[in-house]
Every structure is written in structure tokens, then in C-alpha cells.
Curated annotation (Swiss-Prot):
Belongs to the asfivirus inner membrane protein p22 family. This is Inner membrane protein p22. It comes from African swine fever virus (isolate Tick/Malawi/Lil 20-1/1983) (ASFV). Residues 25-170 are virion surface. Residues 1-3 are intravirion. The chain crosses the membrane at residues 4-24. One of its GO terms (cellular component) is virion membrane. It is found in: Virion membrane; Host cell membrane. Keywords: Early protein, Host cell membrane, Host membrane, Membrane, Transmembrane, Transmembrane helix, Virion. It is a single-pass membrane protein. The keyword Membrane applies. Induction: Expressed in the late phase of the viral replicative cycle.
Length: 170
């Protein structure tokens, strides 16, 4: 009987030690910093879904865009202030169920690139833009402005695709 009592006391002491160590460890982890833009974060960190993170761009896209389906050939992207920027990437047809195409030919005196014009179309006071892609050269091209939140990205040469960061459809 006394060995059973000693074993029970030892088990209780062990559980208390594990609980104290667990609570101490949780207390030592710094809280995640809340953010709205990258400038709110430290160097080498980006604002992803409202918290500062050191995730790679592709991992950030997978976290920010919940159900993203990405072609395995897509190996990188980069952060821009309002978008995730992909090169050699286009939207699968089901992503563009609801989209409109805009032919871009900047005037000679225009100081903005065709891609900057596409970005402005997407940011023009609407939350409905879930992404845009540009294909063409520096002078002439086409913007596809998407307003449907289905995400499926494919590898395609000479396309540039942008997905809004920290977006309501994420």
C-alpha cells in the first residue's frame, strides 16, 4: 500500500513539474506584433494577416490566401507594398470566372509603366479586385483584373500576376 502511495505522490509531483515548465515556456515566448503594413514590422519581416512574420513570400501567400492552389513549377514571388508579385505565373481559368480585360497602351508622356496602371485599376477604391495579371511588353499589353476569390495559379512564361496582400477575401 505504501509503495502505491509513494508512486501516486511521485506521479502528482511529476505532473506539477511538467505543468510549471509548460506555463513558464509559454510565458517566455514574445507576443506576435500586430501590423497593418510592412513598415510596422522589423527588418526582414512582413505584415501577413495582421501579424509580423519572417515567412518567405510563397509561405506567406499560402497563409494569407487560405485555399491557394499553386503549380509546383512556381518557385518564388516577392513582396510589394500592396501585392504578392509573381513572374512567369498566370491565373488558371477557374480563377478568372469573373474578370475583365483592359488593353493598356500608355501615352508617350505617361510616367507610369503598364504594370503600374494595372495596379492602380486594382486599387481604385474597390475591395472586389482579388488579383490582376499583365501580359505584354513594356509599351503595350493587357491587364486581366480578377474579382472572384478562387485561387489557382499556373506557371506561364511572360506573365506577371499580382495578388493583393491582407485582403478581405484572404
Amino acid at each position: 500500500m505504501s509503495t502505491l502511495l509513494i508512486a501516486l505522490i511521485a506521479l502528482i509531483v511529476l505532473l506539477i513539474i511538467i505543468l510549471v515548465v509548460f506555463l513558464y515556456y509559454k510565458k517566455q515566448q514574445p507576443p506576435k506584433k500586430v501590423c497593418k503594413v510592412d513598415k510596422d514590422c522589423g527588418s526582414r519581416e512582413h505584415c501577413v494577416r495582421g501579424t509580423c512574420s519572417s515567412l518567405s513570400c510563397l509561405d506567406a501567400v499560402k497563409m494569407d490566401k487560405r485555399d491557394v492552389k499553386m503549380d509546383s513549377k512556381i518557385s518564388s514571388c516577392k513582396f510589394t507594398p500592396n501585392f504578392y508579385h509573381f513572374t512567369d505565373t498566370a491565373a488558371e481559368q477557374e480563377f478568372g470566372k469573373t474578370w475583365h480585360s483592359i488593353k493598356i497602351t500608355p501615352s508617350p508622356g505617361e510616367s507610369h509603366t503598364s504594370q503600374e496602371i494595372c495596379e492602380r485599376y486594382c486599387l481604385w477604391g474597390t475591395d472586389d479586385c482579388t488579383g490582376w495579371e499583365y501580359f505584354g511588353d513594356e509599351k503595350n499589353g493587357t491587364c486581366n483584373i480578377y474579382n472572384n476569390p478562387y485561387l489557382a495559379l499556373k506557371y506561364t512564361k511572360d506573365h506577371v500576376l499580382y495578388l493583393p496582400r491582407n485582403h478581405k477575401y484572404a
